[in-house]
Amino acid sequence: MALSLSLFLGGRVRTSLARCGFASQVMAGPGSVSCEPDPDSDWEPEERELQEVESALKRQKKAMRFQKIRRQMEAPGAPPRTLTWEAMEQIRYLHKEFAESWSVPRLAEGFDVSTDVIRRVLKSKFVPTLEQKLRQDQKVLKKAGFTREIGQLPVSEDTLKALSAGRSVSGLLMAGDEVSSKSQNHSTALKVAKSHPHSTDAQKKREGRDKRIQVLEESLVPATTALGHQRELQKSATSDSEATGRAGSDTLPSAVLLEELKPGEPGDQSFSSKVVQRGHDFFDSNGNFLYRI
C-alpha cells in the first residue's frame, strides 16, 4: 500500500515538473534553469491531490502505530473463546444474508461480546475438525458457568454421522447427560430473558405484588381467626345464659303453684300441709319432691 502510494506520488510530481518546463530544459542541454509556470495550467487540482495523498499516508502511519501499541498492551495470543461454533456460524450467516440489519455493533450486542470478537469471527476462515469443535465447545460451556465437570466425550461414528447430518455440536454435548441438559435449558432461559427484558421486568413486578398480597393475607388470617373465636365465645356464653334462664324458669314454681301449696288451704289432698327444705330442694312431709330453687 505504501509502495503504491509513493509511486503514485512520484508520478504526480513528475507530471507537475513536466508542466512547468523543467523536463524540456533538461532535454535541450545545460543552461540556466528557470521554471516558469504555464499561465494556462490549473495548479489547484494538482495541489489538492497531493494533499489527499499526504493525508492518506499520515492516516495509514497513525493506524499502524495504533495497532502496534494495541498489540503491545494486550495479552499475547488469541483471546479466550466465548462463543460456540454454532453461534459463530450463526453470526457469519446473519452478517452475510442480512448485512444491513445485522451490523457488527448489533451482532456484538445480540451475542453479548465485543465488536473485536465479532470482527475476528467474520475474518476467520479456519475450518476445524469435528474433534476440535467438540473440545472447544466443551471449554466454552465450562467457562459459561457450568461448574459440573464434563468428561471428555468419545467421538464415535454415530457422533460423526450426526454432525455431518447437520446436528448442532452443543446438542450432542448435552445428549445423555441430565444435569447438563438442565444447565442448557437454564442458559436458553437466560438468552430469552436477555432478548425480552421488558417481559422479565413485568414478571418480576407481578411476582413481587403476589408475594406482598400473600404476606398481607397471612397477617390477616390470625386476626380474623381470633375475631371469629371471640364471636363464638360470645355466642356460646349467650346461649348458656339463655339455657340457664330457661332451666330456671322450668324449675322455679309459678305463683299459682305456690298458692296451691300453701299450708292450711283446702286443695289437692295429695299434698301435705308441711313443706321441708333441704338445700335448694323442697319436699313434703311424706318425702315427695316438690320443686327446686
UniProtKB/Swiss-Prot annotation:
Signal peptide range: 1-18
Glycosylated residues (UniProt): 185
Compositionally biased intervals (Basic and acidic residues): 198-210
Record GO terms (molecular function): rRNA binding
Induction comment from the UniProt entry of this chain: Highly up-regulated in neuroblastostoma cells by RA and MG132 treatment inducing neurite outgrowth.
GO CC entries: extracellular region; intercellular bridge; mitochondrial matrix; mitochondrial membrane; mitotic spindle; nuclear body; nucleus
Record keywords: Developmental protein, Differentiation, Glycoprotein, Membrane, Mitochondrion, Nucleus, Phosphoprotein, Secreted, Signal
Entry keyword annotation includes Nucleus: yes
Modified residues annotated as Phosphoserine in this record: 41
InterPro entries, A to Z: NGRN/Rrg9
Region of interest (Disordered), residue spans: 177-210, 224-254
Tissue and organ distribution: Expressed in heart, brain, liver and kidney. In brain, mainly expressed in neurons rather than glial cells.
Biological process per Gene Ontology, one example term: cell differentiation
Compartment annotation: Nucleus; Secreted; Mitochondrion membrane
Keyword Transmembrane helix: no
Subunit structure: Forms a regulatory protein-RNA complex, consisting of RCC1L, NGRN, RPUSD3, RPUSD4, TRUB2, FASTKD2 and 16S mt-rRNA. Interacts with 16S mt-rRNA; this interaction is direct.
Function of the protein: Plays an essential role in mitochondrial ribosome biogenesis. As a component of a functional protein-RNA module, consisting of RCC1L, NGRN, RPUSD3, RPUSD4, TRUB2, FASTKD2 and 16S mitochondrial ribosomal RNA (16S mt-rRNA), controls 16S mt-rRNA abundance and is required for intra-mitochondrial translation of core subunits of the oxidative phosphorylation system.
Record family assignment: Belongs to the neugrin family.
Name assigned to this protein: Neugrin
Source organism: Mus musculus
Species classification: Eukaryota, Metazoa, Chordata, Craniata, Vertebrata
Name of the gene encoding the protein in the UniProt record: Ngrn
